[in-house]
Regions:
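Extended substrate-binding grooves/exosites of carbohydrate-active enzymes
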Residues: 1-299
Length: 299
């Protein structure tokens, strides 16, 4: 899918070529992959700036634009009164039509971090399934805001973890950074693996997965992210070089929450007890035996 359409996120991105190449590139992608059994829907965009109904978001650099888009805002009913289609909505229809012309067996979606019904992509009525990037608090009222629509969580969670590091009490939720435009400062540059630390626009793995399991209109989710990755260091900036989002770290070792998903997504027996046992005498320790698929667990 496209990471940008006509509106650029950085000076030398695909927006320079969108007008000339979008139809050829989208066509080539679909013809290449439409016979793959793993393809169950097509996305025509990820956090494209055309979604946004506020012009300020289109004037920012890449990092600032993504962060401010993720911050979200309250739904403005006044924006819904205008029923005319914008250029952005027409582009959405155009791209969806290309997909449908080449593959009628799959649905079309787009990953959006603008969850307002005034979102130009949503207003096009060309998306079979609406994709939300984070914004878990809008999952429950989804059907009130989008009657008759379907939802997939195209990016979820954005929880922060460092394998082997634990911050207690484990039931306290740490929001880091407090503001999208300022890094969190701590000398260790680590994040708790109790699933109790996440960014302001995200949520914990447990809370997000509970919503997906219990809300019938939510079809599923993609976890942001499967692996830590170089770039977008969050919540710390330099000298951190990588994200802390993954359920697997850069060395390929699973973090604790990996076993929550394994207990939910596989039929294998799972019992994962943590944290580690390398503590000094007298230190309080919160022990979790929560990641399992047993009827009960006895320590």
């Amino acid at each position: 899918s496209f990471d940008m359409w006509e509106r650029r996120k950085s000076p030398y991105d695909y927006a320079r070529y969108f007008a000339e190449w979008h139809e050829r590139d989208l066509t080539d992608e679909i013809l290449r992959d439409r016979n793959h059994a793993s393809v169950f829907m097509w996305s025509i965009g990820n956090e494209v700036l055309e979604q946004w109904s506020h012009a300020d978001a289109t004037e920012l650099d890449l990092q600032a634009a993504n962060l401010i888009l993720n911050a979200g805002h309250a739904i403005d009913p006044a924006l819904l009164k205008d029923t005319t289609l914008s250029r952005q909505s027409l582009i959405t229809r155009h791209l969806a039509a290309i997909v449908k012309r080449l593959d009628t067996s799959r649905v079309v979606t787009a990953g959006c971090n603008e969850v307002n019904p005034a979102n130009h992509l949503f207003r096009s009525d060309a998306l079979d399934v609406l994709g939300f990037n984070s914004h878990e608090r809008y999952f429950e009222p989804f059907l009130r805001n989008f009657p008759g629509k379907k939802l997939i969580v195209s990016e979820s969670t954005s929880a922060l973890m460092t394998r082997g590091y634990y911050e207690m009490p484990s039931d306290h939720i740490y929001i880091r950074p407090e503001s999208w435009d300022k890094p969190f400062e701590a000398p260790e540059h680590v994040c708790s693996s109790y699933d109790n630390c996440h960014v302001p626009w995200g949520s914990t793995h447990e809370k997000t997965w509970h919503l997906v399991k219990t809300l019938p209109h939510v079809s599923g989710l993609f976890v942001w992210t499967g692996f830590d990755y170089l770039g977008e260091p969050t919540p710390y900036w330099w000298p951190s070089r990588s994200s802390f989002f993954g359920i697997v770290d850069l060395a390929g070792f699973p973090k604790d929450v990996y076993y929550m998903y394994k207990s939910e997504w596989t039929d294998e027996p799972v019992l994962h007890i943590f944290p580690h046992w390398n503590w000094k005498e007298g230190e309080p320790v919160d022990i979790w035996a929560y990641y399992n698929n047993a009827d009960e667990v006895e320590l």
